[in-house]
Amino acid sequence: MAVKLYRIAWQRYSAHIRTADAALVAQLGRFLDLKPGIEETEPPGAVENLITIEESDGAYRIATSDWQLRAGNRGQLLFAALEAVGQIFVYEFSGAIFHAGAFLRGNSATLFFGAPQSGKSTLGFSAWRRGLPLIGDDRVVLMDEGRRVRPFPKCVKLRLPVG
């Protein structure tokens, strides 16, 4: 398969993905509810928002200008690629991003803040199971001087209870 350059855009921000794995890019688009496009040429400054994904002998390498990691299977690859896209968006975004979750109840959003592994995803999942729309479980954005809450792209991570 030929290596192509894809663009995933959110609001006015974009991440570019260089890969031969069109199925992965389509899966990322479905997961993020964003439509990937193909770029004919690399845009100026794309190195700052470029993710390179390569496969060799069943293992995957995911790299940005700041970091790289390896994935041993397709499931790990999807979550590593989602994390890379999220990191690109975090780097470019100038709004008020919080390490928090939020769900919608009527006309209001309820935000819940917490340290990593403190139960934000579990609380969000519980709210969703009760019919409350989940806005986000790990990163949310306050906009319009706090009058609007929006999700910030990052994959949901549910952890099994210990014990």
Predicted regions and their residues:
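A conserved segment at the C-terminal end of the G1
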Residues: T122-L132
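Conserved glycine(s) of the Walker
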Residues: S118-K120
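A noncatalytic interaction/capping subdomain that flanks phosphate/NTP-handling catalytic cores
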Residues: M1-P116, R129-R130, V140-G163
